[in-house]
Design a protein with these regions (language model features):
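Extreme N-terminal tail/first-helix region
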Residues: 1-22
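Charged, gly/pro-rich active-site loop segments
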Residues: 2-8, 83-163
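Anion-coordinating catalytic cores for phosphoryl-, nucleotidyl-, and glycosidic chemistry
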Residues: 9, 18, 53, 62-65, ...
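Short Pro/Gly-enriched beta-strand edge/turn motifs at strand-loop
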Residues: 11-12, 23-28, 125-128
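A generic structural signal for nonpolar/aromatic side chains embedded in well-ordered alpha-helices
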Residues: 20-21, 66-67, 117
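Short beta-strand segments
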Residues: 23-59, 75
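Beta-strand secondary-structure signal
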Residues: 28, 54, 74, 98, ...
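Active-site-adjacent structural patch at catalytic or cofactor/ligand-binding sites
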Residues: 57-59, 69-82, 91-102
Length: 163
């Protein structure tokens, strides 16, 4: 795979990429079947120990159909640092990743994944988990796990070149 052309913008450290994955409010995940691309935006939780991303979803639908046929995905987590007014530049930090999606069946793994997502997204995760996570909710919800195989990062924290 071709590397980043602007080396000064490359994120080299794994921990910095993980930080972006955990700080981002959502991810975009691209998938493809029969040469037709499909892109979705997802709430997520990143599990550092397993180097994976969890997302929740319905148990049926277009995304599920595509992923059952081709479970390889490309995704992005983006931290938008804003447009640099008058400089024709945008400040950001982003991580792109490739991985494979597995839909979880084991209730214990699904519950753990839900807790990872709740801790990533909620201000009061313990309260929300106690109210929302039950054997019934775990059974009802679909949970996907993206096992990350490759990550790359890029950032623009200051205007380097103005038009």
């Amino acid at each position: 795979m071709r590397g980043i052309r602007r080396r000064e913008k490359a994120i080299e450290g794994h921990e910095e990429m993980v930080s972006i994955l955990t700080e981002a409010k959502y991810i975009m995940m691209a998938m493809c079947v029969d040469n037709e691309p499909y892109l979705v935006t997802l709430s997520h939780g990143y599990d550092r120990e397993k180097n994976c991303i969890y997302f929740h979803c319905a148990k049926e639908g277009k995304k599920i159909d595509i992923l059952r046929e081709n479970n390889t995905v490309w995704g992005q987590a983006l931290l938008d640092r804003g447009y640099a007014e008058g400089e024709c530049d945008h400040l950001f930090a982003t991580v792109h990743f490739r991985g494979t999606v597995t839909f979880l069946e084991d209730p214990q793994e699904k519950e753990q994944a839900l807790r990872v997502m709740i801790h990533a997204l909620e201000r009061n995760p313990e309260k929300v988990a106690s109210e929302q996570v039950s054997p019934e909710s775990v059974e009802r919800v679909g949970i996907g796990r993206i096992d990350i195989e490759y990550m790359t990062g890029k950032k623009s924290e200051e205007v380097i070149i103005s038009v």
